[in-house]
C-alpha cells in the first residue's frame, strides 16, 4: 500500500514541500530564517486576531481600547507585547534572510528574489500601518510625516495624500482604513510567501558553496525539520525574554501619550526597524530626492542580479567582497543609529556619509571587487 502522504492531493503538496523535499546537505543555520519568518507570520496573525477582537478603530477610543486590552482582558498584556515585539523579531529575521541572500548570491533565482522584494515592501507597509493603530503621539505624527511624503510626487501629490487620509489631515477615516489594511495585508503576505516557496522549489535551495548540489541532496525531514525546530526554540526564547522582562525596550515612550494634533513630539521617528531608511530619507535636503532615496534604498535589491559581475555565485571564497559586505552591515547599523538621533551636527554629516556609502557599496564597490577577484583567479 502506498503511503497516504504521497497519494492524498493535499498531503502530497505538504510532503513535497516539507518532508521529502530534496535539500542540499550543507546548508547552514543562515537557511533557518525562512521557517522562522513563517513562524513569525503565523504568530503575528494569531496575536493580531485576538487583539482585533478587543480593539476599536476610532480616534476617540483607540488609545483607551489598547489600555483596556492591557489592563482588563485576560492575558491581554502578553498578547499585545507578543504582537509588538513579534514585529521586531519578524524584521530581525527578515533582514538576516535578505542579508543571507546577498552574501550567498541567492538573488540569481530572480523570480524567488523579486517575490521576496514584494514581500519585504508588503511587510513594511503592514508594520507601518500597525504602528498607527494604538493612536499614541508617535502613531499620529508618524502617520502624518510618512503619508505626507507622497505629496512630493509632482502634480498629483497633494490630492493623493488627501485621498489616503480621507480628509485634510490624519483623522478618524485614516485610522479606520489603516486598521482595515493592517488586518488584510498579513493574509496577502501569507499568499505571497506561498508563491515565494513555489518559485524556490522550482529551482531548489542555494547552498553556502554556491555550486550545484544536485548530486548531494538529503530529505528535508528529519534532517532540517529538527534544525528548524532548534531555530524556532531560540526565536521563541528571545521573544519570551523580550516580552516578559523588557516589553517596552524597542518601543517609543511617546506612544504612551494619547495622540494630540496640537502638540508635536520633539523627535518624530519610526520603529527601530525603519530607522536606516528614515536616516537615508533625512540625509537628502530635498523632499522628492529624499523620497526617491528612501524607495531606492530597498528597491536597489531588485537590480542585484544585474550588478553580479563575479564568476562565483556566493561570497564564501571572495574575501574582498566579504569585507565590503560586512562594511555594508556596519553602515546599515550606523544608519539605524543616526535615524534615531535629532537632526543636528554631527549627526547630519554622519548620516549623509553613511547614505552615500550605502549606495556606493552596492552600486560601485561590490561589482568592482568582483571583477578584481575574477582577475586574481585568472577567470
UniProtKB/Swiss-Prot annotation:
<feature type="binding site" description="axial binding residue">
    <location>
        <position position="97"/>
    </location>
    <ligand>
        <name>heme b b566</name>
    </ligand>
</feature>
<feature type="transmembrane region" description="Helical">
    <location>
        <begin position="178"/>
        <end position="198"/>
    </location>
</feature>
<keyword id="KW-0472">Membrane</keyword>
<protein>
    <recommendedName>
        <fullName>Cytochrome b</fullName>
    </recommendedName>
</protein>
<feature type="transmembrane region" description="Helical">
    <location>
        <begin position="320"/>
        <end position="340"/>
    </location>
</feature>
<comment type="subunit">
    <text>The cytochrome bc1 complex contains 11 subunits: 3 respiratory subunits (MT-CYB, CYC1 and UQCRFS1), 2 core proteins (UQCRC1 and UQCRC2) and 6 low-molecular weight proteins (UQCRH/QCR6, UQCRB/QCR7, UQCRQ/QCR8, UQCR10/QCR9, UQCR11/QCR10 and a cleavage product of UQCRFS1). This cytochrome bc1 complex then forms a dimer.</text>
</comment>
<feature type="transmembrane region" description="Helical">
    <location>
        <begin position="33"/>
        <end position="53"/>
    </location>
</feature>
<keyword id="KW-0249">Electron transport</keyword>
<dbReference type="InterPro" id="IPR005798">
    <property type="entry name" value="Cyt_b/b6_C"/>
</dbReference>
<comment type="similarity">
    <text>Belongs to the cytochrome b family.</text>
</comment>
<dbReference type="GO" id="GO:0006122">
    <property type="term" value="P:mitochondrial electron transport, ubiquinol to cytochrome c"/>
</dbReference>
<keyword id="KW-0813">Transport</keyword>
<dbReference type="GO" id="GO:0005743">
    <property type="term" value="C:mitochondrial inner membrane"/>
</dbReference>
<dbReference type="InterPro" id="IPR036150">
    <property type="entry name" value="Cyt_b/b6_C_sf"/>
</dbReference>
<dbReference type="InterPro" id="IPR048259">
    <property type="entry name" value="Cytochrome_b_N_euk/bac"/>
</dbReference>
<feature type="transmembrane region" description="Helical">
    <location>
        <begin position="288"/>
        <end position="308"/>
    </location>
</feature>
<feature type="binding site" description="axial binding residue">
    <location>
        <position position="83"/>
    </location>
    <ligand>
        <name>heme b b562</name>
    </ligand>
</feature>
<dbReference type="Pfam" id="PF00032">
    <property type="entry name" value="Cytochrom_B_C"/>
</dbReference>
<dbReference type="GO" id="GO:0008121">
    <property type="term" value="F:ubiquinol-cytochrome-c reductase activity"/>
</dbReference>
<feature type="binding site" description="axial binding residue">
    <location>
        <position position="196"/>
    </location>
    <ligand>
        <name>heme b b566</name>
    </ligand>
</feature>
<dbReference type="GO" id="GO:0046872">
    <property type="term" value="F:metal ion binding"/>
</dbReference>
<keyword id="KW-0408">Iron</keyword>
<keyword id="KW-0830">Ubiquinone</keyword>
<dbReference type="InterPro" id="IPR030689">
    <property type="entry name" value="Cytochrome_b"/>
</dbReference>
<feature type="transmembrane region" description="Helical">
    <location>
        <begin position="113"/>
        <end position="133"/>
    </location>
</feature>
<keyword id="KW-0999">Mitochondrion inner membrane</keyword>
<feature type="binding site" description="axial binding residue">
    <location>
        <position position="182"/>
    </location>
    <ligand>
        <name>heme b b562</name>
    </ligand>
</feature>
<dbReference type="InterPro" id="IPR027387">
    <property type="entry name" value="Cytb/b6-like_sf"/>
</dbReference>
<feature type="transmembrane region" description="Helical">
    <location>
        <begin position="347"/>
        <end position="367"/>
    </location>
</feature>
<keyword id="KW-0496">Mitochondrion</keyword>
<dbReference type="InterPro" id="IPR005797">
    <property type="entry name" value="Cyt_b/b6_N"/>
</dbReference>
<feature type="binding site">
    <location>
        <position position="201"/>
    </location>
    <ligand>
        <name>a ubiquinone</name>
    </ligand>
</feature>
<keyword id="KW-0349">Heme</keyword>
<feature type="transmembrane region" description="Helical">
    <location>
        <begin position="226"/>
        <end position="246"/>
    </location>
</feature>
<comment type="function">
    <text>Component of the ubiquinol-cytochrome c reductase complex (complex III or cytochrome b-c1 complex) that is part of the mitochondrial respiratory chain. The b-c1 complex mediates electron transfer from ubiquinol to cytochrome c. Contributes to the generation of a proton gradient across the mitochondrial membrane that is then used for ATP synthesis.</text>
</comment>
<keyword id="KW-1133">Transmembrane helix</keyword>
<keyword id="KW-0479">Metal-binding</keyword>
<dbReference type="InterPro" id="IPR016174">
    <property type="entry name" value="Di-haem_cyt_TM"/>
</dbReference>
<keyword id="KW-0679">Respiratory chain</keyword>
<dbReference type="InterPro" id="IPR048260">
    <property type="entry name" value="Cytochrome_b_C_euk/bac"/>
</dbReference>
<dbReference type="Pfam" id="PF00033">
    <property type="entry name" value="Cytochrome_B"/>
</dbReference>
<keyword id="KW-0812">Transmembrane</keyword>
Amino acid at each position: 500500500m502506498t503511503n497516504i502522504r504521497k497519494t492524498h492531493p493535499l498531503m502530497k503538496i505538504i510532503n513535497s514541500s516539507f518532508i521529502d523535499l530534496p535539500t542540499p546537505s550543507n546548508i547552514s543555520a543562515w537557511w533557518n530564517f525562512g521557517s522562522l519568518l513563517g513562524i513569525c507570520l503565523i504568530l503575528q496573525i494569531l496575536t493580531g486576531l485576538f487583539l482585533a477582537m478587543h480593539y476599536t478603530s476610532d480616534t476617540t477610543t483607540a488609545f483607551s481600547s489598547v489600555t483596556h486590552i492591557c489592563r482588563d482582558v485576560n492575558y491581554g498584556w502578553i498578547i499585545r507585547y507578543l504582537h509588538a515585539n513579534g514585529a521586531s523579531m519578524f524584521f530581525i529575521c527578515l533582514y538576516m534572510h535578505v542579508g543571507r541572500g546577498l552574501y550567498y548570491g541567492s538573488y540569481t533565482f530572480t523570480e524567488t528574489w523579486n517575490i521576496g522584494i514584494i514581500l519585504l515592501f508588503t511587510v513594511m507597509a503592514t508594520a507601518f500601518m500597525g504602528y498607527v493603530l494604538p493612536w499614541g503621539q508617535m502613531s499620529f505624527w508618524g502617520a502624518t510625516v510618512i503619508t505626507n511624503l507622497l505629496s512630493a510626487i509632482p502634480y498629483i501629490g497633494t490630492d493623493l495624500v488627501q485621498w489616503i487620509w480621507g480628509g485634510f489631515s490624519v483623522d478618524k477615516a485614516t485610522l479606520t482604513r489603516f486598521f482595515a489594511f493592517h488586518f488584510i495585508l498579513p493574509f496577502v503576505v501569507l499568499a505571497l510567501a506561498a508563491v515565494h516557496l513555489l518559485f524556490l522549489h522550482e529551482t531548489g535551495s542555494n547552498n553556502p558553496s554556491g555550486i550545484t548540489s544536485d548530486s548531494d541532496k538529503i530529505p528535508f525531514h528529519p534532517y532540517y525539520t529538527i534544525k528548524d525546530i532548534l531555530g524556532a526554540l531560540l526565536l521563541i526564547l528571545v521573544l519570551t525574554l523580550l516580552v516578559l522582562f523588557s516589553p517596552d525596550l524597542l518601543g517609543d515612550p511617546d506612544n504612551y501619550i494619547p495622540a494630540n494634533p496640537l502638540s508635536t513630539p520633539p523627535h518624530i521617528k519610526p520603529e527601530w526597524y525603519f530607522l536606516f531608511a528614515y536616516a537615508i530619507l533625512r540625509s537628502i535636503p530635498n523632499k522628492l530626492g529624499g523620497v526617491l532615496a528612501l524607495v531606492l534604498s530597498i528597491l536597489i535589491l531588485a537590480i542585484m542580479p544585474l550588478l553580479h559581475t563575479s564568476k562565483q555565485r556566493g561570497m564564501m571564497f571572495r574575501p574582498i567582497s566579504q569585507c565590503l559586505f560586512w562594511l555594508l552591515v556596519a553602515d546599515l547599523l550606523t544608519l539605524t543609529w543616526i535615524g534615531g538621533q535629532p537632526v543636528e551636527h554631527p549627526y547630519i554629516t554622519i548620516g549623509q556619509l553613511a547614505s552615500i556609502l550605502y549606495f556606493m557599496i552596492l552600486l560601485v564597490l561590490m561589482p568592482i571587487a568582483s571583477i578584481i577577484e575574477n582577475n586574481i583567479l585568472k577567470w
